[in-house]
Regions:
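SIR2/sirtuin-family catalytic core signature
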Residues: 1-19, 25-27, 101, 122-124, ...
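A conditional alpha-helix N-cap/helix-loop micro-motif detector
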Residues: 1, 87-88, 178-182, 207
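Flexible, glycine/proline-enriched loop segments at strand-loop-helix junctions
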Residues: 82-85, 172-180, 198-201
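Electropositive nucleic-acid engagement tracts
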Residues: 114-116, 124-127
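Active-site gating loop/helix substructures
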Residues: 126-194
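A short secondary-structure junction signal
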Residues: 118-120, 162-168, 210-214
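Gly/serine-rich nucleotide phosphate-binding loop at the start of the catalytic core
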Residues: 1-107, 115, 121, 281-285
Length: 285
């Protein structure tokens, strides 16, 4: 695959990598009738402003708009609005490839259930997906299950809207304020990140909160594996900067990247099948 070293590609295809999905990974998704579509953080902010603040405060941050809206209308209506716009979204081609690859873990700051639906739609996924939203979920047993892949939902999930202990987090900046009942999720991710490469998809590196999140996960730069940053907006200077921080940069969308991975996976399986057949022929002789 272009822009990705053979070593990191093999790490991914051999099941040693962590997939980390942001809002950009859901952008190409939509509901069956086309009424609802995946949103960026800014689009979600504008939606909340239109619904609760008469279109005002769009120049403010998502974190600020979320706090003001929750104070004005309470948490419930905000959660219901998000649920309305995400619950009917369908997995993209990119999502459908995820269950075909073995992962050390999958982490996401998205609230939607696109990954869950992708595994449900696959009749023979490589692993059994186990969702983890809070500290009360059985994290250790999931991590010790060789057939399971943990899905760490760092900012909450629309499946838990009625759980007042786990409110949806509207930005990475808010994570430190709402870590109560989520400490194990982030500590688990950081432990895994120390020994396994992370593939970041769907994050805009121009977003300061996202940069903080990435550096928080990968703070020990010189002692961790190289990571992968997939972002179609990457320019020459961005690639130079992130490369100096032990990232391999791929200027593709999430769907484009996953399609490329799927092609690499198919090539590997074809080579393996040929090798097995040749071995069988040798034994027959």
């Amino acid at each position: 695959m272009e822009h990705l070293t053979e070593y990191l590609l093999n790490q991914i295809l051999n099941g040693n990598a962590i997939l980390f999905l942001g809002a950009g990974a859901s952008l190409e998704s939509q509901s069956e009738d086309g009424k609802y579509k995946g949103m960026t953080g800014n689009q979600l902010k504008d939606l909340i402003c239109d619904e609760f603040l008469s279109g005002k405060s769009k120049n403010k941050s998502l974190s600020y708009v979320g706090a003001v809206t929750k104070d004005l209308a309470s948490t419930g209506p905000v959660h219901e609005l998000i649920n309305k716009h995400t619950s009917e979204l369908l997995p993209t081609v990119g999502h459908s490839i995820i269950p075909k690859i073995r992962w050390k873990a999958i982490a996401t700051t998205n609230y939607d259930e696109l990954v869950e639906k992708a595994y449900k739609n696959n009749s023979k996924p490589i692993q059994i997906l186990k969702r983890i939203v809070g500290d009360n979920d059985d994290i250790q047993s999931i991590l010790s299950d060789v057939n399971a892949v943990p899905l760490l939902k760092l900012h909450g999930c629309i499946s838990r809207l009625n759980d007042h202990q786990l409110p949806l987090i509207l930005s990475s900046h808010d994570y430190h304020k709402f870590r109560l009942n989520r400490n194990s999720l982030f500590s688990t991710l950081k432990e895994l990140a120390y020994n396994h490469p992370i593939v970041f998809c769907g994050y805009s590196i121009s977003d300061e909160n996202i940069r903080d999140l990435i550096f928080d996960v990968s703070e020990i730069k010189n002692e961790r594996p190289k990571y992968v940053l997939v972002d179609p907006t990457l320019e020459k200077q961005d690639i130079s900067y992130w490369s100096s921080n032990r990232f391999e940069c791929i200027p593709l969308t999430f769907v484009q990247f996953m399609k490329s991975l799927g092609e690499e996976l198919n090539d590997n399986m074809a080579k393996l099948s040929t090798a097995v057949k040749n071995t069988a022929i040798t034994f027959k002789k």
